[in-house]
Amino acid sequence: RDFAVMQQAQTITIQSTDEAKTLETLAYVWSALQKGGATRHSLLVNLGGGMVTDLGGFAASTFKRGMAYINVPTTLLSQVDASVGGKTGINFGGLKNEIGVFNCAQSVILSSMFLRTLDRENLLSGYAEMLKHGLLSTTENWAELLNFDITEPDYDILLGLVAKSVS
């Protein structure tokens, strides 16, 4: 909240588990937006992993018939998958991503700062998705991915590989 424009920002906190990717959590976000006076001209910033960017993007896409949103993905998997491509949605009726829309974020902000906080499981999960992308990419990019040491990551190099993965 160091920026003047952010002084009026409202924080909406939700559980970031797949079990919370529900209509109830969505209604909570809609209610918070409504109580906070959000309009179609407001901006929702989704800071978190894939569950947060999926649900937040869907909330923004459907509140007041659509408002702008920005994704700031904090996991490697969300940086290379969930936060790009406009996929938004919630789980419903026991099915994953059963209700949603495609609506791209105004911007996606990638930072290696978040990647430095991840445990091994989260790094490997995102790296596996990058390898899938690499199979469809150039032989040079594929070689870079295979040569990257995910067990001792250089986060600046990793962020460059993320950028290639989402391009």
Which functions belong to the PLM regions below?
Residues L146-S167:
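Oxyanion-binding "anion nests"
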Residues A38-I70:
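Active-site and donor-binding regions of nucleotide-sugar-utilizing enzymes
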Residues F58-P153:
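A glycine/threonine-rich phosphate-anchoring loop and its flanking beta-alpha core
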Residues R1-L43:
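ATP/NTP phosphate-donor binding region
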Residues L23-L26, G56-G57, E121:
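Conserved strand-to-helix beginnings and helix N-cap segments that scaffold or border functional pockets
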Residues W30, A128, A163-S167:
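Amphipathic, well-packed alpha-helical segments that form the structural scaffold of globular domains
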Residues S16-D18, M51, L76:
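Residue-level detector of flexible, active-site-proximal loop/helix-junction positions
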